[in-house]
């Protein structure tokens, strides 16, 4: 046919059989990618330390999505929470991956069959004998089936009525596990961090989809609406489908980046706003304060802080710190976290407790400044030592660790104090293994960042695709040069205003 590469989809115009074939093949590719990617991730995933080396630190992309839907066991004998199991059952990570690959193969065969046997009777209009599709009826069928799937997911899978439930955790990502969820029918269901909203919204949306599908199956569109919205044109279907996809992509980009019940931090890592707002730091200080109120020592109070909570309060886990084009997992950046060194408390020779000012998200370097409880600068690591007034040496800063591996250890050597002050800029201090993966020390983003960037980018691209194909289908006759007033003869010079018959010139 000699079509240019950007017009090759023309071959499925007016060919319903092969239109179906290419869509089945597309499904085969999507399912095949998902299954293959899952097997690859399982081959490289290390489940041994779910606290300091969780899936999101290792750059896992599809494992978190399987996990949030109820898959936690592997045929390798491990559980995602760190335990060992003897009977993982068929729906393990490998089982789901295998099911996707088998499904992909069946779709591949079905696509070939429909490509070869494209001229089926079902696609022929009995009145004209030509291939045609009843698009409003097909819309009704798809809406009905999507509604059934949506309702079933919300009413059975999420609630645990017939299914595992979904991943549910506390606000600080410490106690996450798979559990059944009751639908939230009150106003709390609209809170994006309430898991019950997932069940209730799927039930409600599914019910609406079923009713709307039945409506479109039983009621024909009015002729003027059919013609006005070009319902007989397959490009209208393409345009509106792209609209649905880009809208969904924008929504999930938002829920992923800003966080929600569907994007738990245990599976996708913390959000950047949790670092910006000192979210975990405040909870840590609250717990320490509660411990001190119970007459615990500082050492005892800090020792009771979960290592998992301390690890969230580290800038290396902020998805906005990694550049978009720095390939690799977080572990390839700052290394594999081995252990929490403890919380450093700095004091000057006058006895003031000093706090290191933390690095904001979008800084690569930041001055080391230590302030007291009132925010007054008491010490720093100066750029020019000749002009310094607050250097660690001059102020006599010491550091003492509470909790973690260095619990009870103190340092007064200025070089060591400055080393830990620099590291305290980045949040809680962890020992990081850079040798194993040859990590380069440059921060990487988490799967939360990659997912957001990918979906926001494609949503923008698909938005333009929707506008493009929508305009093509609405103004198809204009673009083809078919003008409804084509029969009106316009003669240059016959009117004072070109084409305006009310300004016809008088013949002298």
Curated annotation (Swiss-Prot):
Keyword Thylakoid included in the entry's annotation: yes
Compartment annotation: Plastid, Chloroplast thylakoid membrane
Keywords: Chlorophyll, Chloroplast, Chromophore, Membrane, Photosynthesis, Photosystem II, Plastid, Thylakoid, Transmembrane, Transmembrane helix
Transmembrane segments: 21-36, 101-115, 140-156, 203-218, 237-252, 457-472
UniProt similarity note: Belongs to the PsbB/PsbC family. PsbB subfamily.
Protein function: One of the components of the core complex of photosystem II (PSII). It binds chlorophyll and helps catalyze the primary light-induced photochemical processes of PSII. PSII is a light-driven water:plastoquinone oxidoreductase, using light energy to abstract electrons from H(2)O, generating O(2) and a proton gradient subsequently used for ATP formation.
Protein name: Photosystem II CP47 reaction center protein
Upper lineage: Eukaryota, Viridiplantae, Streptophyta, Embryophyta, Tracheophyta
